């Protein structure tokens, strides 16, 4: 680590007014990327037995941020493309919530295991300058089209769970990261977000997102050394299934991140099962017994306790938000490429055993925003 580089990064963050966690706006979030799709397949949501619109319901329960993923050109689905995301942003704004737009920079899922380059950019995979240009122009153009409709997001993720090399070939590990290449790509995305301005002159906030608390500090240290530009928020995924850390260890890791980089963080992906059963559909669930932490059983009460403890962990570590991943991906007649139904219905915030009634764990939304 070059101390001068780190010092310059921290000075820039301070100069742009990075707020202390104690005074920063608190974000209570829900990732609703699947809602349009499952509603088209007949999904319904209830509170006290009455049918409810999920956007309006979550806003009433305290949510002020909706996270939405964006794929470049997903020819295998009509959802999570630009047209679908535009509809979702409109719904979020009607419900009075901010939007965090999550650019995957892929035609498919992007995560630590895979960061497949979009097909339209594949010919330039070995040219970092051309890739940076693609990222800049794509990000700029999407945000410009949204801005024309008054839908510029409040916050933008430049990549999703970018623990490994971005824009790479399929069936590659992405490790070790080529940081010269990665920095060009990331900085291009950051510049494009900074260049977008709403009518009031404001620009979207910028986030970089890493999966699992134990990976955040080393990743950002390497990014700073490589010259990756400042960001407004650090995004973190925390899933006990894939993390080596329990709650107290995760808190300690995130507290170090907050202090070392003097940048607010948000847990932008977290979920927990309320049962180990499924809804009887044809899609195997991703979160099973291997996803449980001691003291948090797969029950409605266990899910509620886990989420409210995640809120406490986040606040104690200096974080400013928690976003539940896919709380509304309930079972329906829709199919994924791996089965009919949902792979997540036991970890949503709707109890399929009670007609998709809102679960008690939704209380975390008000808890994260409490004074």
Regions found by a protein language model. Name each.
Residues 4-16:
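Bacterial N-terminal signal peptides
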Residues 23-98, 104-135, 235, 241:
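N-terminal substrate-binding region of glycoside hydrolase catalytic domains
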Residues 28-32, 66-68, 99-103, 154-158, ...:
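Hydrophobic faces of well-ordered beta-strands that scaffold small-molecule active sites
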Residues 33-35, 71-73, 104-108, 158-163, ...:
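Active-site beta-loop-alpha junctions enriched in small/polar residues
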Residues 42-59, 135-145, 214-225, 304-310:
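Short, acidic/polar
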Residues 43-46, 256, 275-313, 317-318, ...:
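Aromatic-rich peripheral "rim/lid" segments of glycoside hydrolase catalytic domains that contact
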Residues 54-55, 199-205, 214-292, 308-319:
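Glycoside hydrolase catalytic-domain groove-lining segments
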Residues 81-84, 111-231, 243-252, 335-351:
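Active-site cleft segment of glycoside hydrolase catalytic domains centered on the general acid/base Glu
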